[in-house]
């Protein structure tokens, strides 16, 4: 169900949501959080698809703020005045929750916090998500300051390097970036490989992945911090994601390799036959669901962001 509310206000939007809940015989108290999405019109549907998928695991109210909405509202006297258009999605069009899309015009664009406050789920955590371009300092952004968790995605920003530098400079304990979340399966498999005997020291490591790929440099920083060994980064312009990690040990080479475009990896350990294992490239849905599952600060990510330069990301 999709309901358009042109030239409206937050009171009318809240009333419409209450009306729809009453018609369906349900309550909004089952929502575990409010997800604020600060996005563009171009990116809106892609972000909502991911939010819908994530809401099946985390029933939530999604409030999307589209701040590049270009139309204007002109009063009869010919003056441009602030106004708000909105859309409410329920049922099959909204996952396990409801979606509110706000299209502020003119001066309202500068006051997103006043628009979303009346629409928040009471007594529930607030998560702010910027699917592409993030503010320079998310913790002091008008929406970010309201949130108990802030999610960015530096890899999908227009200027990835600048975004990484800003996030590092203005890091806050509640910040997370999906470039780190994409590494969860790789880190789990590598940790599992190192848990197997013999527990000999790692001498060096090498990682292969795309050029200017944030996850590649985060994984290298994690290995360097965890193993205290030199890590070589090899950039492959044709790769779309990380393709291999190689660890050198006295008794031979340990490797985790995933062919470009593949969804299976190969684990090779000294003295053992190579083993195939599922390792698909993580989708945006996967990453967002993981971050909504873990709202608490990630101490390992925090250490990497604080202690490692971002110039090469």
Residue ranges and their predicted role:
Residues 227-228, 239-241, 250-313:
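Long, compositionally biased intrinsically disordered terminal regions
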Residues 1-120:
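An N-terminal, globular interaction/scaffold subdomain
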Residues 157, 161-251:
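A contiguous, surface-oriented mixed alpha/beta subdomain in the mid-to-C-terminal portion of proteins
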Residues 53-64, 120-127, 145-151, 224-234:
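Structural alpha-beta junctions
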Residues 1-31, 177-195, 289-313:
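Short N-terminal or domain-adjacent regulatory/targeting segments
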Residues 61-71, 129-132, 153-157, 230-241:
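A generic structural motif
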Residues 84-89, 93, 173-181, 197, ...:
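Extended, compositionally simple fibrous regions characteristic of intermediate-filament-like scaffolds
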Residues 97-191:
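Internal, hydrophobic cores of structured domains that mediate oligomerization or house catalytic pockets
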């Amino acid at each position: 169900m999709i309901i358009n509310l042109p030239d409206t206000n937050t009171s009318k939007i809240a009333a419409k949501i209450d009306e729809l809940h009453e018609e369906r015989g349900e309550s909004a108290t089952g929502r575990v959080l409010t997800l604020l999405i600060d996005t563009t019109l171009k990116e809106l549907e892609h972000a909502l698809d991911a939010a819908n998928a994530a809401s099946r695991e985390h029933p939530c109210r999604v409030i999307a703020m589209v701040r590049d909405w270009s139309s204007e509202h002109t009063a009869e006297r010919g003056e441009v005045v602030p106004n708000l258009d909105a859309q409410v999605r329920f049922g099959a069009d909204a996952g396990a929750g409801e979606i509110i899309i706000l299209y502020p015009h003119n001066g309202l664009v500068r006051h997103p916090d006043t628009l979303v406050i009346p629409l928040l789920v009471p007594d529930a955590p607030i998560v702010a998500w910027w699917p592409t371009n993030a503010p320079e300092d998310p913790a002091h952004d008008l929406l970010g300051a309201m949130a108990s968790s802030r999610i960015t995605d530096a890899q999908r920003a227009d200027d990835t390097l600048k975004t990484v530098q800003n996030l590092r400079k203005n890091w806050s304990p509640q910040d997370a970036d999906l470039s780190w979340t994409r590494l969860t399966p790789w880190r789990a498999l590598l940790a599992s490989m190192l848990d197997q005997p013999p527990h000999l020291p790692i001498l060096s490591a090498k990682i292969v992945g795309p050029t200017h790929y944030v996850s590649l440099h985060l994984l290298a920083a994690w290995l360097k911090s965890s193993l205290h060994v030199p890590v070589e980064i090899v950039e492959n312009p044709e790769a779309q994601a990380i393709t291999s990690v190689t660890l050198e040990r006295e008794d031979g080479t340990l490797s985790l390799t995933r062919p470009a475009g593949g969804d299976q990896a190969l684990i090779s350990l000294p003295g053992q036959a190579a083993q195939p294992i599922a390792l698909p490239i993580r989708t945006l849905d996967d990453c967002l669901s993981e971050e909504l599952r873990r709202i608490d600060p990630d101490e390992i990510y925090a250490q990497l962001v604080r202690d490692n330069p971002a110039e090469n990301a």
